[in-house]
């Protein structure tokens, strides 16, 4: 997972070199095969989830706090999910900031 400490040297090097890291979503989606009529629709719906998941790993593990100049780019995942995700993150923050997890 991207929150693994084994990625720390990559985050540090990219930040030091002022080099954006690109995440292209969709590579981890299982192959549903062409025999299933909804295969393409299932793939298209899951593409943005994989981008979100990568971003969540970095956000919640503190990567962006440890590397404030790290540049992260999500490509080919659309942006329709961004407003709803930001709203959810704000809600989670409000609920968790005074808990033992905050």
Describe these PLM feature segments:
Residues 1-102:
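Catalytic pocket-lining loop regions of alpha/beta-barrel enzymes
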